[in-house]
């Protein structure tokens, strides 16, 4: 039985009912409907911290989903799980893949920047300031892209960019 049919939370049940109604009335292929069901089940598993189950659902959703925009969100969520698991290289790969399909995902740019900033901090701890600066410069580039897409957001990143003189704001 799909996970979305066994959850006990009222909000989750309501979402599932509405999603099922929409799936019946919106003209989509059976593959897209299955992809959405896997995506929805992946989101539910992810919200409960069941990352292995979420990944299984997301991988199946990516296999079935044909729309690049919808695939971008599936790939983004896979990136989130890899980030949570400390698998930063894999996370970056999935954020890149999401952005290839949808370049208007500021949260993907932000998460990539956070990973690069973290790696810069790690390089400092290892005594490698040259590598640290390269990571920080990369973080700055990603944050600039996130900020360009949503200028009112990422205030902490904007402050960091100002303090480190990596970007001047008007």
UniProtKB/Swiss-Prot annotation:
SMART domains registered for this protein in UniProt: TPR
Highest taxon, organism lineage: Eukaryota
Bilayer topology annotation: Peripheral membrane protein
Major location category of this protein: plastid
Keyword annotations of the record: Chloroplast, Membrane, Photosynthesis, Plastid, Repeat, Thylakoid, TPR repeat
Secretion signal, residue range per the UniProt entry: none
Pfam family, one: TPR_1
GO CC aspect terms: chloroplast thylakoid membrane
Renumbered ranges of TPR repeats: 35-68, 72-105, 120-153
Entry-linked Gene3D superfamilies: Tetratricopeptide repeat domain
One GO BP: photosynthesis
Localization annotation: Plastid, Chloroplast thylakoid membrane
Record function comment: Essential for the assembly of the photosystem I (PSI) complex. May act as a chaperone-like factor to guide the assembly of the PSI subunits.
Family to which this protein belongs: Belongs to the Ycf3 family.
PANTHER family: CELLULOSE SYNTHASE OPERON PROTEIN C, TPR REPEAT-CONTAINING PROTEIN MJ0263
Name of the protein in its database record: Photosystem I assembly protein Ycf3
Organism of origin: Hordeum vulgare (Barley)
Lineage, highest ranks first: Eukaryota, Viridiplantae, Streptophyta, Embryophyta, Tracheophyta
